Amino acid sequence: MDQYSNLFAFEDYLGAQARSIPDLPEVDVLSPRVVRVLGGNPGQMQLQGTNTYILGTGAERLLIDSGQGRARWEQLMASLAAEHKFRISTVLLTHWHLDHTGGVPHLFRIFPELRGANAIYKYHPDPSQQAIVDGQVFSVEGATVRAVFTPGHSTDHMCFLLQEEEAIFTGDTVLGHGTTGVEDLEEYMQSLRKIQSLGCRIGYPGHGAVIENMQQKVQQEIDRKQRRERQVLLALQNIQREKRTVGDANGAATQAELIEAIFGRLPADVADRFFAPYMKDILMKMARDKQVGFRFKGGQKHWFANVSQENPVCR
């Protein structure tokens, strides 16, 4: 299992996704230039399914993401194209994950002219695909989008700013419900602040309902991740204090001790497989921020807080 898959098991993510989420229609007209088509792949990770978006008002339309490759999505796309007499001329993929890219072969069946047209774009393109450059502009009648490089959820993640609306297609960087998995926390936080600086009002996410207050949602994501950092720092302080009372002058904690302090006692395979990658990432970010440090002992990193014990971090 890769790090991306592991990340979906983290407590923040699963706790948020466990809450009830609203039903979404398979096809929904969100604005005069945006139609959402569900990917037909509902699940714990995908929520109601992957959102794919048809943009534009003319005979040629732009598509953001292609779902996971489900037959139902192909049927919906073919039906919409026939009914409204349009074709997809450009496909923009937010990132490499299969639930966003798996429908590309289905598009070739619906729109055979796409094959060989150099019209499929991704940050790290597959053979026969084209690269996306940060700031690159794509347009069709009625819709103009600008690519915004937002790594963190994945190394290649792109969001797309819709210039005709105060809106942004967020992919998996910000979801309509709950929070997302993160591969690189430091990059993710930078991407959130980059999105926030754009001042968008509406978010069209890769999963879940439309985000009606984008600025508020992004701030909630920033706050959530910062709370987790504070929790780790507080746990380190407590462990250091406890160890020093029993004569351990260094008082540093292993990653495993931190996981147990924060999440409770877990089966070893669960802690190692699901929580260890998350804890490693957050500790490395905090080390770069000089909030924590580590020393090697017995071949392991032992972590300590770089703050005064007389000034403990608030919960």
From Swiss-Prot:
Pfam families: Lactamase_B. Its cofactor is Zn(2+). The keyword Cell wall biogenesis/degradation does not apply. Keywords: Hydrolase, Metal-binding, Zinc. GO terms for molecular function: hydrolase activity; metal ion binding. Zn(2+) 2 binds at D99, H100. Disruption phenotype: Abolishes the production of endocrocin. Induction: Expression is positively regulated by the transcription factors brlA and laeA. GO terms for biological process: endocrocin biosynthetic process; secondary metabolite biosynthetic process. The active site is at D99 (proton donor/acceptor). Belongs to the metallo-beta-lactamase superfamily. This is Atrochrysone carboxyl ACP thioesterase. The lineage of its organism: Eukaryota, Fungi, Dikarya, Ascomycota, Pezizomycotina. The gene is encB.
